[in-house]
């Protein structure tokens, strides 16, 4: 463990471009098992995984192979999608006490509460994808290389840091 590294956290909010600069899940984030991908008030997807960070990365890579609807949405809306927000949460948060911190039940609770556009399972009334976004079925207009998008995200992060 790195000296001075913080302990586990229950919630992290990061832009997709920032997440794409992290090759490995930071140790304090490893217990975060739920994730939300959104653009402001538009919630695209809610999911779960024993390591949510890794699952978001899987969606990103699988979008290039059309194996992930969320990943495809990211690719089809690049470069705007690099500014979307990724929320990583722990099912151990107090807000999930009513469902006894059960991971499946916590995910279902978030889906019912947020009605994400892309979740079809467990979602009685998914929000329609606003017309401002290209659907995941659209042909991508960005480079078909994940590494190129990761580099573009890195440039955007550096430009943002210079402005502040």
Task: State the predicted function of each range.
Residues 1-32, 38-44, 48-164:
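Boundary/linker segments flanking structured domains
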């Amino acid at each position: 463990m790195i000296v001075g590294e913080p302990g586990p956290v229950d919630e992290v909010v990061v832009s997709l471009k920032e997440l794409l600069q992290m090759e490995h899940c930071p140790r304090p984030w490893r217990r975060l098992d739920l994730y939300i991908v959104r653009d402001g008030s538009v919630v695209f997807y809610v999911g779960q995984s024993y390591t949510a960070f890794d699952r978001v990365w899987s969606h990103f890579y699988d979008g290039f192979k059309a194996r992930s609807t969320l990943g495809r949405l990211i690719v089809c809306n690049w470069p705007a999608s690099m500014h979307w927000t990724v929320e990583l949460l722990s099912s151990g948060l107090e807000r999930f006490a009513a469902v006894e911190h059960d991971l499946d039940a916590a995910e279902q609770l978030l889906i019912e509460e947020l009605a994400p556009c892309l979740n079809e399972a467990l979602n009685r009334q998914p929000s329609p994808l606003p017309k401002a976004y290209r659907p995941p079925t659209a042909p991508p207009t960005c480079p078909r290389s994940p590494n190129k998008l990761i580099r573009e995200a890195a440039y955007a992060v550096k430009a943002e840091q210079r402005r502040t």
